[in-house]
């Protein structure tokens, strides 16, 4: 349904991820669940060469076309392409957002590494739902208790009953970032792989941000960018590693779960 809505609202040559993004947002707006006069949308804007740069424009066009021109769209970018009145983000906001991403990455690791081997069908998903609610409460409290939360999550998944004598083929999932991570965009590929007898392996979303920071080193060495930009990129990598240190620490202590590696 989201794809259909997106295709109706976007121009004909829009890429598949943009159809999904616009379709999801418009589906939510027209669902009746929200007061459209007290609603705002936020979307990242990269400024790069691909159509991800046009997402904000696509969304605004779709809103106007559907009769909701009053709904503001906040363009979130590191470069500061737009000034968004009424929206202020600071380091506390960024830290909380990155902690949320770290928890999401952790959930992918603990669920995908255990669910194919669970002794009691549905036990891993039940455990996931339990800790998902706990994670939401943690984020609503500004990330307080983040370190204890991730250690408790790993400990609980370390003790879920598994068929330890079975080893399934591991299949890595790669591709465009939205399609890779969003189940409704990739036809629930993880579940399909598990149904076919495989263990799905998904890269961390935080690793994508690290790759973006690491790019500054390449641009400095080969494309004429400044040494300062490379240094700032390395500082960004160090900041992300420090932020997800509790996750890495908890996974290193695990008897069955694998931690992420440094870029």
Positions of the model-derived regions?
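Single conserved hydrophobic/aromatic residue that forms the stacking wall/gate
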Residues: 1-6, 11
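A generic structural motif
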Residues: 5-7, 70-80, 199-209
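Glycine- and acidic
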Residues: 8, 40-45, 172-175
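Glycine-rich, highly charged phosphate/nucleotide-binding loops
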Residues: 14-31
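Gly/Ser/Thr-rich loops at beta-strand to alpha-helix junctions
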Residues: 15-16, 45-57, 175-184, 207
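Conserved alpha/beta core surface patches that mediate binding of polyanionic ligands
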Residues: 21-26, 56, 149-155
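N-terminal glycine-rich phosphate/adenylate-binding segment common to multiple enzyme folds
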Residues: 27-89
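A charged, amphipathic alpha-helical module
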Residues: 88-263
């Amino acid at each position: 349904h989201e794809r259909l809505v997106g295709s109706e609202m976007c121009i004909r040559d829009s890429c598949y991820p943009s159809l999904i993004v616009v379709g999801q947002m418009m589906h939510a707006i027209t669902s009746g669940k929200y007061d459209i006069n007290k609603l705002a949308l936020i979307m990242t804007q990269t400024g790069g060469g691909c159509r991800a740069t046009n997402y904000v424009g696509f969304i605004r066009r779709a809103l106007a076309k559907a009769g909701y021109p009053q709904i503001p769209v906040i363009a979130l970018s590191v470069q500061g392409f737009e000034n968004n009145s009424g929206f202020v983000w600071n380091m506390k906001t960024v830290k909380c957002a990155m902690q949320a991403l770290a928890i999401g990455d952790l959930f992918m690791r603990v669920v995908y590494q255990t669910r194919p081997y669970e002794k009691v069908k549905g036990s891993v998903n039940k455990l996931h739902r339990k800790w998902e609610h706990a994670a939401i409460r943690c984020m609503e409290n500004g990330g307080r208790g983040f370190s204890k939360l991730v250690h408790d999550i790993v400990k609980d998944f370390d003790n879920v009953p598994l068929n330890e004598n079975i080893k399934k083929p591991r299949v890595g999932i790669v591709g465009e970032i939205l399609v890779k991570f969003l189940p409704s965009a990739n036809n629930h590929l993880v579940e399909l792989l598990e149904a076919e007898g495989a263990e799905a392996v998904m890269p961390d979303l935080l690793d994508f941000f690290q790759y973006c920071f690491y790019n500054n080193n390449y641009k400095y060495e080969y494309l004429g960018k400044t040494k300062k930009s490379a240094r700032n990129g390395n500082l960004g990598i160090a900041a992300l590693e420090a932020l997800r240190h509790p996750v890495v620490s908890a996974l290193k202590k695990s008897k069955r779960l694998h931690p992420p590696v440094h870029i």
